[in-house]
């Protein structure tokens, strides 16, 4: 009986540590970066991705909506297990070509950013990326067509093309 109780305690202890469903909303809450699977740093006035995020090797979802991030570092590829990246409502206007190496990326949310094109290297993501959200990005028709040609099998969310002057 004692042995069974000890085994149950050990099992429950391990299960309590690894919490893939836990959503972290502050870096202060993180004690072990390898235990972070979902990180939502919305509206934190960040100008860049904090360096400690790149050590979160098991990170599956990174939500940076509503910050002040204008560019991404090539270090973003260190997040090799990232499946969902949300950059909505940031003043970002381009993505680094090295992101084409993010083979696990399934969703890229760029809603209401300044992005109007993607690096040609992103063509390799056509078989793995499932959703590209470019709503409210003020894309011109030729910009939409270029993205469509680059990623033909990816589901895209965007507004009707606008040929409006700024």
What do these predicted ranges mean?
Residues 31-70:
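LRR N-terminal entry segment and analogous cap-like coil->beta motifs
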